[in-house]
């Protein structure tokens, strides 16, 4: 055979795992790209890396690089490579060794970042910089997408941001790494269109990953000059994304909460009022804040605009706002309730006097007091309460009652004449006061729009109520003016028109319409009073809940209206004719007037279902019990029609009354529960918005005093230009100083935040990962010490006498899966059936296989074509496949073993029979003796079975020859020839079960060219791991009269096909059959495992028979030396 072709990845073509077709192992079909079955040497390699065995890893890599017999870039069943295992264990020396020895890094950099292994990240970044070529993808981009642990769009910087690791982010940013800028979700550029067309899911997830990186607190701290405003903007942008892209709403909302929490955490680091004031008043467009100046609170206004409720409700900010709110009234919060009520009542009664004083002398003491936020609030609230009082007087016609009680005789006569003259009346004195208030309200809203802008104005829901209220009042004023002109014209033509009673007016007379709009405006005016409840801690949460419930009512109204309209259409179509009959009975008077006296019932019933609008009204009032079954007793109605009408009405009552109304109640209860859960935050946020409206430099005078000219208004006109010039000069002079001061404070906050994060991390309790890390470091140090001692000529065999170290459950599970050949692939459920429906013609399952669909032959008859089509349809049917599985399982609860497991099953049976036979040889053997054989790194089932059989054999041997003391043989230790002879003699009478390498009786090895005699003599009797099959087949003792077994034949050269590779089937061959040129030799069940060491010239020095997989972790074989 010629030499095998070497692949670029360091794997020979004969053992390449990247085959052109999926491989099937143990009934599993492994798809392309997924981890392929491993060779035994590859399993040993991964196991040595996981346990930190540097010497053996170094030897395996050297041998692999010279002979190309294994794939050093192999993966375990879960897709983890050697570098990944070393990174998970945070073994920097192992990572350096693997990188230096040429192991492909693949996505190891991402794994190191994910594990937050900073040293490995630095090493892998340097390695990536060395091997990267311009125009080619990076190492982590070359990983197969089927086995990649990370999404293709993930970059090192993005992953570090996801982990929020400040140190790794700093390293990457210092190197010039950058996070890609996300496109707008509505972006229509060529790149976005192409990515969406290729894979819309991947494009959407890529946007989520980018925003997850951008929301990292550490990344914001490192890249933003103003982390607080950056967090605000990201939070608001994520809110818009959540509303636009509903599919990823939960992810975006989680990121939004993360940004909000980061802003609050930064705010936690403020320590003085000066720091807090500078942060909240920073505005690049205005002059810097100085202690004692009026606070603009620009940052707080932005927080309210971005709805940062937790930031606004923070205790630091609330304390500062409280001090500003009650400025000018020292000690007010410490007063008793009675004193507070007296103080507020005094301001409420004297508010006109305060307003007049401010209009005349705005800079006096009283004028300065009125500019304080709390006093301004009390003045405005008192003025609004007085307006509501005027509305009550107008609605009750109090001016007429006052004339009747306190008026003179002439005034009473004029009042009587006005009552008779109902048309063409001018507004009363109280109505004129209302007009002045309305003008003041409109002017106040106009000033607010100019001050804050239209967008900010529309964000406040209470402004909508103000706008609606003002619109209604203005409409009333216009209609009253139009009605007065119209009526005055009519009276001028006919004076008797002024005495027409109101019941004779037209239905849509302008004055009647104005009165209706005036009543609606009064309702909104009274509701605006709820806004003042935000000040009170008890009524504030109720006011917020009311706002949420209004939103629920609006959402519920759409469904309710749909159901109402549907049933109204049906009932109107069914009962319109009979309603028309009732209407004809009602309107029987001359002129088409309704006869309410004689036919009052008909006049009521026809309106119920006379048209679509009346039907809708009837169903609406039916929700409140205002419509009954009597309304269906119409003239001439038939029983069938009446039945269908009642059935539809009953269905509407069930759906709308029982279901939908209860749904509305549940929605409102849920809204209140949400507010109650966060009542403190919600109330403080609502109260802060109310406070901020009085902190602003808005109109100090309330309506209607704000429309009257004052001294301050005149002074402001003449000083406007000079103030503008002073402000610009101040801005230019202090802009740099302001930025420097704010920047220093923000850096201090960031430093404190990072330091607090590190302290919190250091104070975390010790976890299981920390303990495992310590164990791994101790294990690695043990292997290094053993190698040093062995290279120094010391005997380290006694190190193997130590009992097996307990391993974490995670490591046990990983080792079991690795050695068992575990694969993440579906099992093919199918089998070959004979004509009688038996599996493989034997009535039992040998191996589950999928029968292939028959191919079309070159020439076939019509009959053959029909048979082929019918068989294809049968094989593709689900029923056939399920029946195949059922026949294969034979109605068994556990199924049958596969072909690869049959030999293990037979060996288990033989082991049970052999144990019984050994016990029957000497039933009185003592108990409690332990086996001198130690099996390491086997699965629990195999280790327990071997230990049990060894104990039985040892007890029988000790009971028959008590004077002969058994020799304990540690693993990887040379067994003397004299001990072997004693054992062979003992096996003739009472066989002792040993698990060791089979060798010829001759103690002296036969010279072999190219093989170190010293190495063979030193390691010829090292114990090898055996599975139960090899134990029974080769090492189990037989009866005294049974003929001795022949030695095992020499194993052929391996082909390394995973389909014939059986893990755990390891057996030592005869010494004369070993060759230094063979690394591993195997057949279906036997292996000879060797680790070849090379001298400096590349020649063979010797061959170490590694005992088992445990030798990698328990000790390191010494490099054999030449003997003279």
From Swiss-Prot:
Region named Disordered: 1-24, 978-1013, 1031-1124
Annotated spans, Calmodulin-binding 2: 853-895
Residue spans of biased composition, Low complexity class: 10-21, 1035-1063
Disulfide bond entries: none
InterPro entries membership: Ankyrin_rpt, Ankyrin_rpt-contain_sf, Ion_trans_dom, TRP_dom, TRPC_channel
Effect listed in the UniProt record for changing residue 713 to G: Disrupts Ca(2+) inflow through the channel. Calmodulin has little effect on Ca(2+) flow
Tissue specificity field: Expressed predominantly in the rhabdomeres of photoreceptor cells.
Any single GO CC term annotated in Swiss-Prot or TrEMBL for this entry: plasma membrane
Pfam families on file: Ank (PF00023), Ank_2 (PF12796), Ion_trans (PF00520), TRP_2 (PF08344)
PROSITE patterns: ANK_REP_REGION, ANK_REPEAT
Residue ranges of the region described as Calmodulin-binding 1: 710-728
GO biological process terms on file: body fluid secretion; calcium ion transmembrane transport; calcium ion transport; calcium-mediated signaling; cellular response to anoxia; detection of light stimulus involved in visual perception; monoatomic cation transport; monoatomic ion transport
GO molecular function per UniProt: calcium channel activity; calmodulin binding; identical protein binding; inositol 1,4,5 trisphosphate binding; monoatomic cation channel activity; monoatomic ion transmembrane transporter activity; protein heterodimerization activity; store-operated calcium channel activity
Membrane topology summary: Multi-pass membrane protein
Superkingdom of this protein's organism: Eukaryota
Domain text: Binding of calmodulin to binding site 1 is Ca(2+) dependent, whereas binding of calmodulin to site 2 is Ca(2+) independent.
UniProt family annotation: Belongs to the transient receptor (TC 1.A.4) family. STrpC subfamily.
Name used for this protein in its record: Transient-receptor-potential-like protein
Organism: Drosophila melanogaster (Fruit fly)
Gene: trpl
């Amino acid at each position: 055979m010629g030499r095998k072709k070497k692949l670029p990845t360091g794997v020979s073509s004969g053992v390449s795992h990247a085959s052109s077709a999926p491989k099937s192992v143990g009934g599993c079909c492994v798809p392309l790209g997924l981890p392929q079955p491993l060779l035994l040497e590859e399993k040993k390699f991964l196991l040595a890396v996981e346990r930190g065995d540097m010497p053996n890893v170094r030897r395996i890599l050297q041998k692999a690089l010279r002979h190309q017999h294994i794939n050093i870039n192999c993966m375990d069943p879960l897709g983890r490579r050697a570098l990944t295992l070393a990174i998970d264990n945070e073994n920097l020396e192992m990572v350096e060794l693997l990188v230096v020895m040429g192991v492909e890094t693949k996505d190891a950099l991402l794994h190191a970042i994910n594990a937050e292994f900073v040293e490995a990240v630095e090493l892998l970044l340097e390695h990536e910089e060395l091997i990267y070529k311009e125009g080619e993808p990076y190492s982590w981009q070359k990983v197969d997408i089927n086995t990649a642990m990370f999404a293709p769009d993930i970059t090192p910087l993005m992953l570090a941001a996801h982990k929020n690791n400040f140190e790794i982010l700093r390293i990457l940013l210092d190197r010039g790494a950058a996070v890609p800028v996300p496109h707008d979700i509505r972006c229509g550029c060529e790149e976005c269109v192409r990515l969406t067309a290729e894979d819309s899911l991947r494009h959407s997830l890529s946007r989520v990953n980018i925003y997850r990186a951008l929301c990292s607190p550490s990344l914001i701290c490192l890249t933003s000059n103003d982390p607080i405003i950056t967090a605000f903007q990201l939070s608001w942008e994520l809110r818009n994304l959540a509303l636009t892209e509903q599919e990823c709403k939960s992810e975006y909302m989680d990121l939004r909460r993360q940004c909000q929490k980061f802003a609050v955490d930064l705010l936690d680091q403020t320590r003085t009022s000066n720091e807090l004031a500078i942060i909240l008043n920073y505005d690049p467009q205005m002059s810097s804040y100085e202690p004692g100046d009026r606070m603009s609170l620009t940052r707080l206004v932005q927080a309210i605009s971005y709805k940062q409720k937790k930031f606004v409700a923070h205790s630091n900010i609330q304390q500062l706002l409280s001090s500003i709110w009650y400025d000018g009234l020292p000690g007010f919060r410490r007063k008793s309730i009675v004193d507070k009520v007296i103080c507020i009542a005094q301001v409420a009664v004297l508010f006109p006097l305060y307003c007049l004083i401010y209009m005349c002398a705005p800079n006096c003491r009283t004028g300065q007091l009125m500019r304080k936020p709390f006093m301004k609030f009390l003045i405005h609230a008192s003025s609004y309460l007085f307006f509501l009082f005027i509305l009550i007087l107008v609605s009750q016609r109090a001016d007429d009652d006052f004339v009747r009680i306190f008026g003179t005789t002439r005034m009473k006569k004029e009042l009587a004449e006005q009552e008779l003259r109902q048309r063409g009346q001018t507004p009363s004195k109280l109505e004129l006061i209302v007009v002045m208030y309305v003008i003041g309200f409109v002017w106040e809203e106009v000033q607010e729009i100019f001050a804050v802008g239209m967008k900010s104005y529309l964000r406040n829901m209470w402004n909508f109520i103000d706008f609606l209220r003002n619109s209604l009042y203005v409409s009333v004023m216009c209609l009253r003016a139009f009605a007065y002109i119209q009526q005055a014209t009519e009276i001028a033509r006919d004076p008797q028109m002024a005495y027409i009673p109101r019941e004779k007016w037209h239905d849509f007379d302008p004055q009647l319409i104005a009165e209706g709009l005036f009543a609606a405006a009064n309702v909104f005016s009274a509701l605006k009073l709820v806004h003042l409840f935000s000040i009170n801690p008890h009524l504030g949460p109720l006011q917020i809940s009311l706002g949420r419930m209004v939103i629920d009512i609006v959402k519920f109204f759409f469904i309710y209206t749909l159901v109402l309209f549907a049933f109204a259409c049906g009932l109107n179509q069914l009962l319109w004719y009979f309603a028309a009959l009732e209407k004809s009975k009602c309107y029987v008077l001359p002129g088409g007037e309704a006869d309410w006296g004689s036919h009052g019932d008909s006049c009521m019933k026809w309106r119920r279902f006379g048209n679509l609008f009346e039907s809708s009204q009837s169903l609406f009032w039916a929700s409140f019990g205002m419509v009954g079954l009597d309304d269906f007793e119409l003239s001439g109605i038939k029983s069938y029609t009446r039945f269908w009408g009642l059935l539809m009405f009953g269905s509407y009552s069930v759906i709308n009354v029982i279901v939908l109304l209860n749904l509305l109640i549940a929605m409102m209860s849920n809204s209140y529960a949400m507010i109650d859960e966060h009542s403190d935050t919600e109330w403080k946020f609502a109260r802060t918005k109310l406070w901020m409206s009085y902190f602003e430099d808005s109109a100090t005078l309330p309506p209607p005093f704000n429309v009257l000219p004052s001294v301050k208004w005149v002074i402001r006109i003449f000083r406007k230009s000079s103030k503008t010039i002073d402000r610009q000069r101040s801005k230019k002079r202090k802009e740099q100083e302001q930025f420097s001061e704010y920047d220093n404070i923000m850096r201090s906050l960031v430093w404190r935040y990072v330091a607090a994060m590190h302290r919190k991390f250091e104070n975390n309790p010790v976890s299981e990962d920390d303990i495992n890390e310590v164990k791994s470091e101790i294990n690695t140090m043990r292997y290094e010490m053993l190698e040093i001692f062995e290279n120094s000529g010391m005997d380290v065999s006694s190190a193997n006498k130590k009992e097996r170290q307990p391993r974490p459950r995670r490591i046990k599970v990983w080792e079991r899966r690795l050695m068992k050949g575990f694969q993440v692939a579906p099992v093919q459920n199918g089998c070959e059936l004979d004509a009688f429906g038996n599996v493989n013609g034997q009535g039992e399952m040998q191996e589950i296989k999928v029968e292939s669909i028959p191919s079309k032959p070159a020439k076939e008859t019509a009959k053959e074509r029909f048979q082929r089509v019918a068989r294809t349809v049968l094989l593709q049917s689900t029923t056939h496949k399920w029946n195949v599985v059922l026949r294969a399982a034979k109605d068994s609860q556990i199924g049958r073993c596969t072909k690869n497991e049959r030999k293990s099953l037979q060996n288990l049976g033989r082991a049970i029979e052999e144990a019984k036979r050994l016990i029957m040889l000497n039933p009185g053997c003592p108990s409690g003796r332990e086996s001198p054989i130690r099996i390491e790194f086997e699965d629990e089932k195999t280790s327990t079975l071997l230990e049990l059989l060894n104990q039985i054999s040892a007890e029988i041997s000790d009971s028959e020859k008590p004077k002969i003391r058994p020799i304990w043989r540690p693993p990887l230790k040379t067994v003397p020839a004299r001990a072997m002879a004693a054992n062979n003699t003992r096996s003739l009478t009472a066989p002792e079960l040993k698990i060791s390498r089979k060798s010829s009786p001759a103690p002296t090895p036969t010279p072999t060219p190219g093989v170190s005699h010293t190495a063979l003599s030193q390691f010829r009797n090292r114990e090898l791991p055996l599975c139960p099959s090899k134990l029974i087949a080769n090492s189990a003792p037989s009866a005294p009269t049974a003929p001795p077994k022949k030695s095992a034949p020499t194993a052929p050269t391996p082909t390394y096909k995973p389909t014939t590779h059986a893990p755990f089937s390891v057996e030592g061959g005869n010494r004369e059959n070993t060759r230094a040129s063979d690394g591993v030799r195997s057949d279906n069940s036997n292996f000879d495992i060797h680790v070849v060491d090379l001298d400096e010239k590349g020649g063979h020095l010797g061959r170490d028979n590694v005992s088992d997989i445990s030798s990698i972790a328990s000790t390191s074989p010494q490099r054999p030396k030449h003997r003279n």
